[in-house]
């Protein structure tokens, strides 16, 4: 993996170029990873994504919690000279393997001195540093993160934060020694919750290793994934991230997974974070929300979301978002999307995911323009107010409206998921 910084500005973060594979595509940063479930982009077949969302090369964000059960099959596949991206139906696309799924809440607890819990759809599994590197060696991703204890959030105690660092250091000492079993590039995990001393210790341990032993950083332990990332207190988050970034080398990319809100993403880019993912778009789709926030100056005040379960849009024969060029907005209406959810049609989340990914990827195109022109503060203010006078709320709350077959003719009914 090769990372080159193009420019650094005082107020707008930095632009860079990331090349994951030799001879592979030149990817511009700030970069957006495509979050997957078991290697598949949620609700979208590979050809649907390529024809209706983007034909540009994408970096697939894989997670061991969704891919671990495929390790043995992938080992045989890789022995035939193929890669994991080919296996999941995205041939030629670079990929990155994380430990935890940023789209789903990671249960807290079950931590042991020598074991890291891995929560999968099959239940809880126990990982040692040895079993972890063996599984990663079978999958052979282009980039992979080191084994870490990131079970911390804003409420974690100082003792828990320190334990996360101590356990991660112990895991990583073995990972650094055995990383040669994997052809891909290792990312050093930076943990320690919201404790600056613990974060500094985690960074120090990584930087004590030979520079060539890892190619970048993944900053974890700020939230428990899922919707929790959309409601973080930035007054607590940003000082910790800034504290970390100041101690990291400039020539290594910094990755921060999770469903951070667009406003938080802009602030993190200002601080120097390079790589994010599309888990926010997934969380919006999963909770029946269309992304409608604007990043273009106009005279009309906009809102962050459109709730397609809302009965008030059942006769609105207009696109989800004006001037949007995605398939959903060009061919369908708000009323139709509402109807699809009323009738529990599979096409509903497909069309919604097409729109949300298209909109979120366009947002990152606009971000790169703003960073290049050193106008990120103006973009941040625009996104914050949505052409209005007050701050907008981008947090996503779990939608508890579900469809019951017995009451399908009556539409949505309130029920706990």
Curated annotation (Swiss-Prot):
Its cofactor is Zn(2+). GO terms for cellular component: cytoplasm. This is Queuine tRNA-ribosyltransferase accessory subunit 2. Heterodimer of a catalytic subunit and an accessory subunit. Zn(2+) binds at residues 324, 326, 329, 355. GO terms for molecular function: metal ion binding; tRNA-guanosine(34) queuine transglycosylase activity. It is found in: Cytoplasm. It comes from Drosophila ananassae (Fruit fly).
């Amino acid at each position: 993996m090769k990372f080159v910084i193009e420019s650094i500005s005082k107020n707008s973060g930095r632009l860079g170029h990331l090349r994951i594979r030799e001879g592979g595509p030149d990817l511009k940063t700030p970069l957006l990873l495509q979050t997957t479930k078991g290697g598949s982009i949620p609700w979208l077949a590979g050809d649907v994504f390529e024809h209706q969302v983007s034909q540009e090369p994408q970096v697939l964000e894989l997670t061991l919690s969704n891919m671990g059960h495929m390790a043995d099959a992938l080992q045989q596949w890789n022995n035939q000279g193929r890669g994991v991206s080919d296996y999941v139906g995205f041939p030629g696309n670079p990929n990155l393997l994380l430990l935890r799924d940023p789209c789903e809440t990671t249960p807290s607890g079950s931590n042991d001195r020598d074991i890291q819990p891995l929560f999968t759809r099959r239940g809880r599994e126990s990982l040692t540093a040895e079993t972890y590197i063996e599984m990663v060696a079978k999958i052979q991703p282009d980039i992979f993160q080191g084994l870490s204890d990131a079970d911390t959030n804003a409420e974690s105690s100082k003792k828990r934060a320190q334990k996360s660092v101590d356990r991660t250091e112990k895991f990583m000492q073995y990972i650094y020694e055995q990383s040669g079993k994997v052809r891909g590039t290792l990312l050093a995990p930076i943990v320690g919750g919201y404790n600056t001393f613990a974060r500094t210790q985690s960074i120090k341990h990584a930087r004590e290793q030979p520079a060539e032993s890892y190619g970048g950083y993944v900053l974890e332990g700020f939230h428990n994934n899922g919707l929790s990332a959309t409601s973080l207190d930035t007054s607590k988050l940003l000082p910790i991230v800034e504290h970390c970034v100041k101690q990291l080398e400039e020539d290594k990319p910094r990755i921060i997974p999770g469903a951070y809100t667009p406003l938080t993403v802009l602030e993190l880019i200002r601080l120097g974070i390079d790589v994010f993912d599309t888990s926010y778009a997934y969380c919006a789709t999963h909770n029946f929300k269309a992304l409608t926030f604007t990043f273009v100056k106009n005279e009309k005040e906009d809102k962050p979301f459109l709730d397609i379960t809302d009965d008030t849009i059942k006769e609105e024969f207009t696109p989800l978002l004006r001037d949007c060029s995605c398939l959903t907005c060009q061919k369908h209406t708000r009323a139709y999307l509402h109807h699809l959810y009323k009738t529990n049609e599979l096409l509903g989340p497909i069309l919604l995911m097409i729109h949300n990914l298209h909109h979120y990827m366009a947002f990152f195109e606009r971000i790169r323009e703003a960073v290049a022109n050193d106008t990120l503060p103006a973009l941040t203010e625009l996104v914050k107010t949505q052409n209005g006078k007050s701050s907008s709320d981008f947090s996503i709350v779990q939608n508890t409206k579900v469809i019951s077959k017995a009451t399908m003719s009556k539409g949505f009914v309130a029920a706990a998921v």
